[in-house]
Amino acid sequence: MEKKTYYFVGIKGTGMAALARLLKDLGNEVLGSDIEKETFTQQPLADAGIPVLSFDPANLKEGMIVVQGNAFSDDHEEIVRAKEMGLKIQSYPETVEQVVANHTSIGVAGAHGKTSTTGLLAHVLSNVEQTSYLIGDGVGVGVADARFFVFEADEYRDHFLAYHPDYAIMTNVDFDHPDYFKDLADVKDSFETYGRQVKKGLFAWGEDKSLRDLNVDVPVYYYGTAPDDDFRAANIVRTPDGSTYDAYYKDQKLGTFTIHLYGEHSVLNSLAVVAVAYMEKIDLEKIKAELANFSGVKRRFAEEDIADMKVIDDYAHHPSEIKATIDAARQKFPQKELVVVFQPHTYSRLAAYLTEFGQSLSRADKVFVTPIFGSIREQNGSVSAKDLEDLIPGSEDIDQASITKLLAYHDAVVVFMGAGDIEKYEDDYKARLKERG
């Protein structure tokens, strides 16, 4: 890619910060602006030598390409100034597509499991081939002359329709983001449109009915555990140390693979990685070694030992994700009591899946529900945290003032789940736990 100067409006956003770092790695000049509030993306940007400025139209200079963050409207002062100056303005997805076009690219899509699968694929490929990658947990790495580009393709507001990758992985199709999609059929239509933009091949989870019905123009390779899947995991053994399985392509055994990750979804995610590597003729012995070395991505089953407790931080905010996270915790800690602190994320999502949230959370031994985290677009709604508690036997409400309730538990697992600001509850608990000892 020709070296350019990029100015990010909203550079502290998770995806924006990752993309900024990737473009900087590729030799471009990168800077941007955002609000004053401290974020976890700030230090990595500083480490990369990327200036983060306060909003000011005077920041803009001739020749800059302005990347407009999704949260910033056309009437934002810097966007207005950029238009007056005649600068090129493009979205995050449009900017990612420019990187996609210069590599053998693999876009990972799915209602759930995108970040975990992207992180796993990026880790594996980058240790066996030159690979650039962009992960939804805020990590972006650019490698000059890379063979591969691995990136997360988000379906929200149809952002992934900007992309035309060589390959796509589709982990599942589910009705999420009820503030944008009308129903499951609407979501499936978007995935199918994205699939038609893929150039070489598509890897899709075989048990997903919507993915089985895809009408696309490239070969679809199904992965899973069923006999009719193209790539199949068999003889799966799950223990507190992780999972081991035999991988097959059709009737051909590709090898025995081990991952130190938990839950059935982790087996499926790793099988998708094996499938991509096989189709690109990468040495599977190297893939085997790198799969065994992977420990996970940020905010996806991130563990910490404090006193006699296991504290887990997880991004789960949809019933399917909650079920998968609880399954993973049961696998790794089969003898321990499992306590979940859940922060509902947006009123519309809670209202759309209230019953399903109740069913998934009821798999834990004890559940505490925090106040609802509303989005910028949605600060209230017709549903309450109490409505969810009523569906979960023995559940209780909790907030920062009552976080000490959790100190009653010993030698147990506490999982903090949510996509909002659940960390504030987790940080309070950890501080109290360290005091308790």
Curated annotation (Swiss-Prot):
Q: In which pathway does it act?
A: Cell wall biogenesis; peptidoglycan biosynthesis
Q: Where is it localised?
A: Cytoplasm
Q: Which reaction does it catalyse?
A: UDP-N-acetyl-alpha-D-muramate + L-alanine + ATP = UDP-N-acetyl-alpha-D-muramoyl-L-alanine + ADP + phosphate + H(+)
Named from the GO MF annotations, one term is: ATP binding
Which keywords, in A-to-Z order, does the entry hold? ATP-binding, Cell cycle, Cell division, Cell shape, Cell wall biogenesis/degradation, Cytoplasm, Ligase, Nucleotide-binding, Peptidoglycan synthesis
Q: What class of enzyme is it?
A: ligase
Q: What is its EC number?
A: 6.3.2.8
- Cellular component, GO annotation: cytoplasm
User: InterPro entries recorded for this chain?
Assistant: Mur-like_cat_sf (IPR036565), Mur_ligase_C (IPR004101), Mur_ligase_C_dom_sf (IPR036615), Mur_ligase_cen (IPR013221), Mur_ligase_N (IPR000713), MurCDEF_pg_biosynth (IPR050061), UDP-N-AcMur_Ala_ligase_MurC (IPR005758)
Residues given in the record as ATP binding sites: 110-116
Q: Please list the GO biological process terms of this entry.
A: cell division; cell wall organization; peptidoglycan biosynthetic process; regulation of cell shape
Q: Does the keyword Metal-binding apply?
A: no
* Pfam families membership: Mur_ligase, Mur_ligase_C, Mur_ligase_M
Relate the protein's function as given in its record: Cell wall formation.
PANTHER family in UniProt: UDP-N-ACETYLMURAMATE--L-ALANINE LIGASE, UDP-N-ACETYLMURAMATE--L-ALANINE LIGASE-RELATED
Entry's family note = Belongs to the MurCDEF family.
* Name of the molecule in the record: UDP-N-acetylmuramate--L-alanine ligase
- Organism from which the protein derives: Limosilactobacillus fermentum (strain NBRC 3956 / LMG 18251)
Q: Which gene encodes it?
A: murC
